[in-house]
């Protein structure tokens, strides 16, 4: 039988498996591909193929991530699974594999463990919109009351980190039973039930093209007789010729009008998410715009200087710092296209941060930057990346 080709006519969604080490994240990933392969919605990918994930670099950080794809009757999914705990931390903070939702895997035999808690917290901090729980290894628990107890614990933990613990679907099953065909109810049927829950509960993400227009400024030119041209890659949305836009960040917000869009030296009537364009601005001087600002739909993004962030600090082996840092540390924060100096304030009770740590911290930038929650940044010292972070919340 010829391998079924994935049709891209279904809505696409990015998800991943998260949870404590050895609770069965990779086995579950393999089990999903096995069960969905029966209906032609996936190619079965065995555990050992997923487990030896290749390394990738994102924002100067090496991360091991395995990608599998599959589809249900409703959606096409790209699914990420990471071999080690540190890979999850780095992945979620750098957004190397953006997650529109996640499957939290908890072993029914162990209940929630330290990394279960940490992954839920990270999901909250980096803005993963929704979680679905798979209570794995249920074939190892004979007592139904014990299962109920574990489920209650998981719900309480989710609520503690501001997820709707009472409403989140929890599916009980066994990834191993699905892989070994040993128990249809806990194996095959549970996987189908899980995918039904993922389909229904994880909201369909808004496509970048449907979001408000934003383009980071990469370069600025002055073209005699035409005016000022700003180049960059459109991050999201659409800009049409004749539309009013704002220039945000670094200095006071200015209004201007896009009077032309050019791509590959051709004039277009609009530029959209993913396009590398030159945008001609009416009445804007060459010195009014600089790299590091953004062009955006008026009122859609504001400039900010103070925010709370979740960050991962590279180890010395990863090319990071060799020594810890303390409150009032002043590195550069690289947002989109530019470095801005900022001062780090560590949370009370945190004396210092060691290379390899992930931490919550407060940052005060010396100039405002167009910013919103979930925006990723790199932490740099003299052009060398020493960490990565994500804006968790904005203070001012």
UniProtKB/Swiss-Prot annotation:
Q: Where are the transmembrane segments?
A: none
Q: Where is this region: G2?
A: 60-64
Q: Where does GTP bind?
A: 19-26, 81-85, 136-139
Q: Where is the tr-type G domain?
A: 10-206
Where is it located?
Cytoplasm
GO CC annotations?
A: cytosol
The EC number on file is 3.6.5.3
Show the segment(s) annotated as G3: 81-84
Region labeled G4 — which residues? Answer: 136-139
Q: Which reaction does it catalyse?
A: GTP + H2O = GDP + phosphate + H(+)
Where is region (G1) located? 19-26
Q: Which Pfam families match?
A: GTP_EFTU, GTP_EFTU_D2, GTP_EFTU_D3
Parts forming coiled coils? none
Record-annotated residues binding Mg(2+)? 26
Q: Where is this region: G5?
A: 174-176
Description of how the protein assembles with itself and partners = Monomer.
By sequence similarity, the record places it as follows: Belongs to the TRAFAC class translation factor GTPase superfamily. Classic translation factor GTPase family. EF-Tu/EF-1A subfamily.
What job does the chain carry out?
GTP hydrolase that promotes the GTP-dependent binding of aminoacyl-tRNA to the A-site of ribosomes during protein biosynthesis.
Question: This protein is called what?
Answer: Elongation factor Tu 2
- Native organism is Rhodopseudomonas palustris (strain BisB5)
The taxonomic lineage of its organism, from the top, reads: Bacteria, Pseudomonadati, Pseudomonadota, Alphaproteobacteria, Hyphomicrobiales
């Amino acid at each position: 039988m010829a391998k079924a080709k994935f049709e891209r006519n279904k809505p696409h969604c990015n998800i991943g498996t998260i949870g404590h080490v050895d609770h069965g994240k990779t086995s579950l990933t393999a089990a999903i591909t096995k069960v969905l392969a029966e209906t032609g919605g996936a190619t079965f990918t065995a555990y050992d193929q997923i487990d030896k994930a290749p390394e990738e670099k994102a924002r100067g950080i090496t991360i091991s991530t395995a990608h599998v794809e599959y589809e249900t009757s409703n959606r096409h999914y790209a699914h990420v699974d990471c071999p080690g705990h540190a890979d999850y931390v780095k992945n979620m903070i750098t957004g190397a594999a953006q997650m529109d939702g996640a499957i939290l895997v908890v072993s029914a035999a162990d209940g929630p463990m330290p990394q279960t808690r940490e992954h839920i917290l990270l999901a909250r901090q980096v803005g993963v919109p929704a979680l679905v729980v798979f209570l794995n290894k249920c074939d190892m628990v004979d007592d139904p009351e014990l299962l109920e107890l574990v489920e209650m614990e998981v719900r309480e933990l989710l609520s503690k980190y501001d997820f709707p613990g009472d409403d989140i679907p929890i599916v009980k099953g066994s990834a191993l039973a699905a892989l070994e065909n040993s128990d249809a109810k806990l194996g095959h049927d549970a996987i189908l039930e899980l995918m039904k829950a993922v389909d229904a509960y994880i909201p369909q993400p808004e496509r970048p093209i449907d979001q408000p227009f934003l383009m980071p400024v990469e370069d600025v030119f002055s073209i005699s007789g035409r005016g000022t041209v700003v180049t960059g890659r459109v991050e999201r949305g659409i800009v049409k010729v004749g539309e009013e836009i704002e220039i945000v960040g670094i200095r006071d917000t200015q209004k201007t009008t896009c009077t032309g869009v050019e791509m590959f030296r051709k004039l277009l009537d609009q530029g959209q998410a993913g396009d590398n364009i030159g945008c001609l601005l009416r009445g804007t001087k060459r010195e009014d715009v600089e790299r590091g600002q953004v062009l955006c739909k008026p009122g859609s993004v504001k400039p900010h200087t103070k925010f709370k962030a979740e960050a991962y600090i590279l180890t010395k082996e990863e090319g990071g710092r060799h020594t810890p840092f303390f409150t009032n540390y002043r590195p550069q924060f690289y947002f989109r296209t530019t470095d801005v100096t900022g001062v780090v304030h560590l949370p009370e009770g945190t004396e210092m941060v060691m290379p390899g740590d992930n931490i919550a911290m407060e940052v005060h930038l010396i100039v405002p930057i167009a910013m919103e929650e979930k925006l990723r940044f790199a932490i740099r010292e003299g052009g060398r990346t020493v960490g990565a972070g994500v804006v968790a919340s904005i203070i001012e």
